[in-house]
């Protein structure tokens, strides 16, 4: 009934348990039906949330490229193309989506559905999320509200996208060729220092503390 996020066709469910945001495996839907005419008439905030969730696939893709080149998470071509091939077109007309244009609402919806299918294909949220979603999860764990109301997933991801993109631009401005890797590693905090900081930040929050120490 609304193009509000990409989870409709995804395999997993991101749930807050004991104060922590965790992703649980769950069966994907056998089928999905969306009427673009109905979706185009949904509250504008829902479409805006979906647009923000979909535009997050841009910095998420950059994160995946970094993970691939560093040998941490290899890019899966099939799921990559499910998300990225139609992304530009799906994001091409935000004003028209806001105005309730049926055709462009359908394109946005297709982009979100393909993102969910990509997560199904890889059994991972990697094709559809990156650092920007980590911001959203942190805010979920803090019960973020605006004017007394909980903030939608898409809006949180949208703000996370701005922060993630700024971080990527900051990285691109650095002189990587002359980076002294050994000096950077030497300057990194020891585990003892990190553990002390984690225990201070999550004091009084046992669930958060256990997750912080684990990760």
Regions picked out by a protein language model, each given a short descriptive name:
Residues 80-214:
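Active-site segments that bind and position negatively charged phosphate/pyrophosphate groups
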